[in-house]
UniProtKB/Swiss-Prot annotation:
Chain spans, region G4: 475-478
Ranges for domain tr-type G: 365-535
Biased composition (Basic and acidic residues): 125-178
Low complexity bias: start-end ranges: 57-76, 179-203, 223-239
Residues that coordinate or bind GTP: 374-381, 421-425, 475-478
G3: region residues: 421-424
Protein name: Translation initiation factor IF-2
Region (G1): 374-381
GO molecular function: GTP binding; GTPase activity; guanosine tetraphosphate binding; translation initiation factor activity
InterPro entries from the UniProt entry: EF-G-like_DII, EFTu-like_2, IF2_assoc_dom_bac, IF2_II, IF2_N, P-loop_NTPase, Small_GTP-bd, T_Tr_GTP-bd_dom
Keywords: Cytoplasm, GTP-binding, Initiation factor, Nucleotide-binding, Protein biosynthesis
Length: 868
């Protein structure tokens, strides 16, 4: 291949050499713009020429908007390559290309082909994009038209709302004339659809867009096409850009109006003026419990807590929002703020638990409940054993009843009668009171040979307080010294008049030993029950009273319950005092397991979480949630009462601190465990009565059940004794007590327990010191002996003087020394005693200030042990 080499030939050229200049493309003008209300404004309008790249092209002819033109794929003109032949008239000698030049030219040609193929693919893709762009623009035009219509509708609605708001503002604030411009009727201007891009045809028949120009590569390689820049995004309207054009400035349709944001701000201001008007205060019903925090009270009233605190400060009380105030103060604050108050109490959880009215159409007769009361050893339990054909007395320790018991018997006429046996000992006053409260009839047993005794009088008072009828059973008429008439006469002193003496109280002479007149006694009880007309609803939830409670090692907490209303069934959820549970088993007085217990039936109930207190009322509730509410309230009340009593004790101790220090009161610490709640209650009452100002029993812990290791640990900490009443200690507790030296005492009879504790407490009492006068002696002369010291020469004037006795040295009727007589001599001999009228020598222990004329008084001190 040959080529010409012409020094003047420039193969790499973009075009003819031209000078680069910047021509002004901006034309300016001034336009006067008019606004509403006669306002005008001078506006500078600039007109910019269109910048063209790649030379001047002929102007494009616009195409009608109704006839959109579909863009055609641009044609890429191919410029013919320059001929490789040498110029004929160049006159230059040709030479052969070197191997490197041929290789470079071959590489350049290959690269040019690759670039040409890439440019062809790019051009085809650009043509396809332009074809799809027309369809997209059509869809955009339709969407713009829909948006325009929606915007016009929104403008119309906002104008209407603005007009109504202005009218409302004028009416509310009484404006004389409107400040806002009258509502302008929005005219719907039909805007022409934006015209399609005109398809300008070039002079040579090519499309509007200029074909990519080819740029030659250095070295004579194939030309590389220059890709035209992509069209910029569609500019926003001039109004949105915030500047005016000549066309928009001269147009009358684009008069500036209030913006939407301005209208919204005005609406907000109007709403703010309306919100500043005084609001009508809402009166609320405020529920006020017994205690409430200030924050909670403010929340319930929908008031600020600061306002509540301010009102409290006016009353002279400084509080925080977390402080608790009482119900009275909360009610005063709520009423002062204009609210109504509804007082509630925590005890409202117990409403409807007891004493619900029964339907008179479903009531049916029930068995009477009879309580046997009287003095100790008058034969109450023996009489009940004779009626039941049982032998309960033999099972009682000491032959006295120390537990309250409930039994059910059948009378000769087939009716059932429930008996409650109460102890007669003075310590069981609370048991007798409980028996009188749950009973329908009281049988007062009086021994014919003993008459009316203190516990008999107490039983009469219990029956009168409970307002229940009495039947007098004069027992032990089989004894030779029985005097029933004396019993009737003594009862008159306590306002009990029997039928035989013109009264209304039934009396029956019986003998429990010989079973005399027992049928007559049961007949009188049935007659009295018929007069009372006892009826109840057996189908309602059960209510009853806990007669006795204990902690059984094998069965857990066990409560003896007398069902008074309704029917108690296995599985019922029950509440008694601060304890709750589900009935696991019901055991009758005969020891049989039953499924239910009706009215007036005594049963043992198993299933409590803990042993309830004797005397607590039992009720069946609907679910465990209600049971937990009731028991938690009662437990809280119990803790508060205990805290109040302890704080009261602390206050009294602080007030009497000086007296306690001088008196030196001593405590006798005890840990007491009993078998049942009633016995424990009786023991605590008896020990409390033993206390004096000098010594008292301090009960560290009292409970029901056996003695455990924790009881021993507690007793060890306070060096206390442990008392077990009808209970025993387990192996661990016994071993711990033996190891730590803790004394455990067991008792079965209550008065033995009380007597032993009384003796032990008496040992803590300070003994009484009693002085016995022996005689007087007068000092005649004082001698000073080197080994002994001063010795007084005395004459005994009265009684006698003994060596080692207590003496007082009296000078001018004032006691100057008290001590002991260390030396007593007659002449030179030590003697034990000197009689009246004799002279002797005396010396005191550690005292030598003796003078002539002093009187020595000699006496003996005796120590006498005291007892409670």
């Amino acid at each position: 291949m040959v080529d010409t080499k012409n020094p003047g030939d420039k193969t790499l050229s973009v075009g003819p050499s031209k000078t680069l200049t910047l021509k002004p493309r901006v034309e300016q003008g001034t336009v006067r713009q008019s606004f509403s209300h006669g306002r005008t404004k001078q506006v500078v309008v600039e007109k910019r020429g269109k910048r063209r790249i790649g030379g001047d092209a002929p102007a494009a002819e616009p195409v009608a908007a109704s006839e959109p033109t579909v863009a055609r794929a641009p044609r890429i003109p191919v410029r013919p390559a320059p001929p490789a032949a040498s110029r004929a008239n160049s006159g230059v000698v040709l030479r052969t290309l070197t191997e490197d030049e041929r290789t470079a030219r071959a590489s350049a040609l290959a690269e040019a082909k690759i670039r040409a193929e890439e440019e062809r693919r790019i051009a085809e893709a650009e043509a396809a994009r332009r074809n799809s762009k027309e369809g997209i623009e059509q869809a955009e035009r339709e969407a713009a038209e829909a948006r325009r219509k929606a915007e016009e509708e929104r403008h119309r609605q906002e104008e209407e709302a603005k007009r109504k708001a202005e009218l409302e503002a004028k009416r509310r604030f009484g404006e004389s004339e409107t400040k806002a411009a009258p509502a302008k009727t929005t005219t719907t201007t039909t805007r022409a659809a934006p015209p399609a891009r005109p398809a300008a045809v070039a002079a040579d028949g090519s499309d509007e867009e200029e074909a990519p120009r080819l740029v030659r590569r250095p070295g004579g390689g194939p030309a590389r096409p220059v890709v035209a820049p992509k069209p910029a995004a569609k500019p926003a309207p001039a109004k949105q850009r915030g500047r005016l054009t000549l066309v928009t400035a001269l147009s009358a349709d684009d008069v500036r109006e209030r913006s939407i944001a301005s209208f919204r701000r005005r609406t907000q201001r109007l709403k703010g003026h309306a919100s500043n008007e005084p609001k009508e205060k809402l009166i609320r019903e405020v529920i006020v419990p017994e205690a409430i925090t200030i924050q909670e009270l403010a929340n319930r009233m929908a008031e600020r807590a600061v306002d509540v605190i301010r009102m409290l400060m006016k009353q002279g009380a400084m509080h925080k929002i977390t402080d608790v105030i009482d119900a009275d103060t909360a009610q005063l604050i709520a009423e002062e703020l204009g609210h109504t108050v509804k007082r509630v109490a925590a005890s409202d959880v117990e409403e409807g638990l007891f004493d619900a009215d029964d339907d008179s159409t479903v009531v049916e007769p029930r068995s009477p409940v009879v309580t046997v009361m009287g003095h100790v050893d008058h034969g109450k339990t023996s009489l009940l054993d004779a009626v039941r054909h049982a032998n309960v007395v033999s099972g009682e320790a000491g032959g006295i009843t120390q537990h309250i018991g409930a039994y059910q018997v059948t009378s000769p006429d087939g009716k059932k009668i429930t008996f409650i046996d109460t102890p007669g000992h003075a310590a069981f006053t609370a048991m007798r009171a409980r028996g009188a409260k749950v009973t329908d009839i009281v049988v007062l047993v009086v021994a014919a040979d003993d008459g009316v005794m203190p516990q008999t009088v107490e039983a009469i008072n219990h029956a009168k307080a409970a307002k229940v009828p009495m039947i007098i059973a004069i027992n032990k008429i089989d004894k030779p010294d029985a005097k029933p008439e004396r019993v009737r006469t003594e009862l008159l002193q306590h306002e009990v008049q029997v039928e035989s003496m013109g009264g209304q109280v039934i009396d029956v002479e019986v003998s429990a030993k010989n079973k005399t007149n027992l049928d007559k006694l049961l007949e009188m009880i049935s007659l009295q029950a018929d007069l009372l007309d006892l009826k109840t609803n057996a189908s309602r939830p059960a209510e009853g009273t806990v007669i006795e409670a204990k902690l059984d090692r094998g069965r857990g907490p066990v409560a003896t319950v007398l069902v008074q209303r309704g029917t108690l069934r296995v599985g019922d959820i029950i509440v008694a005092g601060a304890e709750m549970g589900r009935v696991r088993a019901l055991i009758s007085d005969q020891g049989e397991t039953v499924d239910e217990a009706g009215p007036s039936v005594p049963v043992e109930v198993l299933g409590f979480n803990g042993p309830p207190e004797a005397g607590d009322r039992l009720a069946v509730v609907e679910n465990e949630a209600r049971a937990r509410q009731v028991t938690s309230y009662r437990a809280h009340q119990k803790r508060e009462n205990a805290a109040a009593s302890s704080s009261g004790m602390r206050g009294s101790l602080e007030q009497m601190m000086s007296q306690l220090k001088t008196a030196g009161r001593k405590d006798f610490p005890l840990v007491i465990k009993a078998d049942v709640q009633g016995s424990l209650e009786a023991i605590l009452g008896s020990l409390e009565k033993l206390g004096t100002e000098e010594v008292a029993a301090r009960i560290l812990h009292a409970g029901v059940g056996g003695i455990s290791e924790s009881d021993v640990t507690l007793a060890e900490g306070f060096n206390a004794a442990i008392i077990g009443f009808s209970v025993r200690a387990n192996k661990e507790a016994a071993a711990a007590a033996k190891r730590n030296g803790i004394e455990i005492r067991y008792y079965n009879i209550i008065y033995d327990l009380v007597d032993d504790v009384k003796k032990a407490m008496s040992g803590l009492l300070a003994p009484t010191l009693r002085e016995t006068m022996l005689g007087n002696a007068e000092i005649l002369e004082v001698f000073n002996i080197s080994k002994v010291g001063k010795v007084a020469g005395c004459r005994v004037t009265d009684g006698n003087v003994e060596r080692g006795a207590n003496v007082r040295l009296i000078r001018e009727n004032v006691v100057v020394h008290e001590g002991k007589l260390s030396t007593l001599k007659r002449f030179k001999d030590e003697v034990k005693e000197v009689q009246s009228g004799q002279e002797c020598g005396m010396a005191f222990e550690s005292y030598h200030d003796m003078r002539v004329g002093d009187v020595i008084e000699c006496y003996r001190v005796e120590t006498i042990q005291r007892s409670l």
